[in-house]
Amino acid sequence: MRFTKDHEWVIVEGDVATVGITAYAAEQLGDVVFVETPEAGKVVKQGEGLAVVESVKAASDVYAPVSGEVIEGNGELAGAPETVNALPESGGWFAKIKLANPAELDALMDRDAYEAFLGTL
């Protein structure tokens, strides 16, 4: 698992990256009440808006940690947005992206680096 400073995570299997938000981000948002995930076929660049998550506190963009084509959005979140709070780093994923440039992963943090980053906030 790799992480961004915007609190997204990515897990790569082969050439497919599964993307979500971290437990820290979910905790900061509070109770998630709405999620808009991308549709298959959407092409995203690293750092661009990928999804939207709304909570009782705020609406936030979820940014693509990698570039590529969305092959699946997690449609189950529309009917069960609370999954983002309950399972932020597993079942609460937002999208699966076919990687365009695997080298982008090198710029992301591993868990130890991410936890050290959280310590600076």
Swiss-Prot record:
Entries under Pfam families matching the protein: GCV_H
Cofactor: (R)-lipoate
Stored InterPro entries: 2-oxoA_DH_lipoyl-BS, Biotin_lipoyl, GCV_H, GCV_H/Fam206, GCV_H_sub, Single_hybrid_motif
CC annotations in GO: cytoplasm; glycine cleavage complex
Record's keyword terms, sorted: Lipoyl
Transmembrane segments: none
Annotated cofactor note: Binds 1 lipoyl cofactor covalently.
Coiled-coil residue spans: none
Domain Lipoyl-binding: residue ranges: 16-98
GO biological process per UniProt: glycine decarboxylation via glycine cleavage system
Keyword Transport: no
Assembly description: The glycine cleavage system is composed of four proteins: P, T, L and H.
Biological function: The glycine cleavage system catalyzes the degradation of glycine. The H protein shuttles the methylamine group of glycine from the P protein to the T protein.
UniProt protein name: Glycine cleavage system H protein
Organism: Caulobacter vibrioides (strain NA1000 / CB15N) (Caulobacter crescentus)
Higher taxonomy: Bacteria, Pseudomonadati, Pseudomonadota, Alphaproteobacteria, Caulobacterales
Record gene name: gcvH
